[in-house]
């Protein structure tokens, strides 16, 4: 079977777990929402969660806004440091909406689980998946591909589950990234080859695949990276990362295809390195 080949030019230097819907502890959904509204911060409209401090008149402000204020935003009195134990007890019986409810998340949960859920919530804004820190774009999952097509036009896209990712000029000095897209099974995958400078000029390459999709969708796929040539073969197989979690942690933990300069030279041709990439459904 013939493989498509794309050339990736160096780009420069560098799930939300299926939360169980918790039944209302007391009363109806409407009454729970009424209770939750009592905890809204008057500044940012997020929720004031334990430990809860009030001003002398009993007004509440969330822990994020409180350090930025010099007086109570409601009564203009001193903020004070009075602990409101009664409201803390009420908070323990209220189910709070996720902060990304306006983006579509319907989960309500106790305040003790709220921060952990929001860290993994699939409705949290997605960051641009391109390596490096130059692009600060954030948006919904549906907007990621349009963003890449309009703002990162240099990235090549190949169709099919079996392609060749050709990284050019791998001998360039310093930290360098190579990126391309692969489209198959109705999804888009981003292939990344990253070169890092280590100690004493030692260089390491990290190759990984991430899905333009959620963590749950990523679990339906597997990818295989293969360096093949001169009667040698080096392979790596894994589940693609979702762009929701990114690739930084995987690279830091070497949870990807890792090889150094000497290995790269065994497979390179004229300073270019071809990586066979195969995507399959689980």
Swiss-Prot record:
> Which residue numbers delimit the RING-type Zn fingers?
41-76
PTM statement from Swiss-Prot or TrEMBL: Phosphorylated on Ser-19 by ATM and ATR. This phosphorylation disrupts SIAH1 interaction with HIPK2, and subsequent proteasomal degradation of HIPK2.
Q: Give residue numbers for the modification (Phosphoserine).
A: 19
As its record notes, the protein acts as a catalyst of: S-ubiquitinyl-[E2 ubiquitin-conjugating enzyme]-L-cysteine + [acceptor protein]-L-lysine = [E2 ubiquitin-conjugating enzyme]-L-cysteine + N(6)-ubiquitinyl-[acceptor protein]-L-lysine
Localization annotation? Cytoplasm; Nucleus
Q: Name one GO molecular function term.
A: zinc ion binding
Q: Which GO terms describe its biological process?
A: canonical Wnt signaling pathway; cell differentiation; male meiosis I; neuron apoptotic process; post-embryonic development; proteasome-mediated ubiquitin-dependent protein catabolic process; protein ubiquitination; regulation of multicellular organism growth
Task: State the Pfam families in the record.
Answer: Sina_RING, Sina_TRAF, Sina_ZnF
Q: Indicate the quaternary assembly.
A: Homodimer. Component of some large E3 complex composed of UBE2D1, SIAH1, CACYBP/SIP, SKP1, APC and TBL1X. Interacts with UBE2I. Interacts with alpha-tubulin. Interacts with PEG10, which may inhibit its activity. Interacts with PEG3. Interacts with group 1 glutamate receptors GRM1 and GRM5. Interacts with DAB1, which may inhibit its activity. Interacts with UBE2E2. Interacts with SNCAIP. Interacts with KHDRBS3. Interacts with SNCAIP. Interacts with HIPK2; the interaction is promoted by DAZAP2 and results in SIAH1-mediated ubiquitination and subsequent proteasomal degradation of HIPK2.
Q: What is known of its domains?
A: The RING-type zinc finger domain is essential for ubiquitin ligase activity.
What name appears for this protein in its UniProt entry? Answer: E3 ubiquitin-protein ligase SIAH1A
């Amino acid at each position: 079977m013939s493989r498509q080949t794309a050339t990736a030019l160096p780009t420069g230097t560098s799930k939300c777990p299926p939360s169980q819907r918790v039944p209302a502890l007391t009363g109806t959904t409407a009454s729970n929402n009424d209770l939750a509204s009592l905890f809204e911060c008057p500044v940012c409209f997020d929720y004031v969660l334990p430990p809860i401090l009030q001003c002398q008149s009993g007004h509440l402000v969330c822990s994020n806004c409180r350090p930025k204020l010099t007086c109570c935003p409601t009564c203009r009195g001193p903020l004070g440091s009075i602990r409101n134990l009664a409201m803390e007890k009420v908070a323990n019986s209220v189910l709070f909406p996720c902060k990304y409810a306006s983006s579509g998340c319907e989960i309500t949960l106790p305040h003790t689980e709220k921060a952990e859920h929001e860290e993994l919530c699939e409705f949290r804004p997605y960051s641009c998946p391109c390596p490096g820190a130059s692009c600060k774009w954030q948006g919904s999952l549906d907007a990621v591909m349009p963003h890449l097509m309009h703002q990162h036009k240099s990235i090549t896209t190949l169709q099919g589950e079996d392609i060749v990712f050709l990284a050019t000029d791998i001998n360039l000095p310093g930290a360098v990234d190579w990126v391309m897209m692969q489209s198959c099974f109705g999804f888009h995958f981003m292939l990344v080859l990253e070169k890092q400078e280590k100690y004493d000029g030692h260089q390491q390459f990290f190759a990984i695949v991430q899905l333009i999709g959620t963590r749950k969708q990523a679990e339906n796929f597997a990818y295989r990276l293969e360096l093949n040539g001169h009667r040698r073969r080096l392979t790596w197989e894994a589940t693609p990362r979702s762009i929701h979690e990114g690739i930084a942690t995987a690279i830091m933990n070497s949870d990807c295809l890792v090889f150094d300069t000497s290995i790269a030279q065994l497979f390179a041709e004229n300073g270019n390195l071809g990586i066979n990439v195969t995507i399959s459904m689980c």
